[in-house]
């Protein structure tokens, strides 16, 4: 099965991990306009209490997070590092990330995504079996836990 994930929010990354937990052979591709997962320049960010976040997700969903990141208070810095750690682990599990990639078109009848990006795969058309869009305000919908909250910077 081929799963296309649009966006790289914590919720999108959680979704990718859940898919791979259920079926490790799934081909997961994350398309994001961000240059680097975990450090997007947006005016709409998440705050997490890192201690609570790490308790609510499986250990195999994230890699190491620097010890200097405060784990007790809500912060966007903690959310950025958690996103980065979850993305790293997702790639270790076989997911593919297309960074600096803009979705040009989604053909739902053909189950195809047309994209243009700045990475190794500059542009193209990918087929998918499942498409999940976590861009914009959709990025803030929690899948299960409520360890984070949305803020405006």
Question: What do the predicted segments below correspond to?
Answer:
Residues 14-70, 80-81:
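N-terminal FAD cofactor-binding segment of flavoenzymes
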Residues 54-56, 90, 98:
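Hydrophobic alpha-helix position signal
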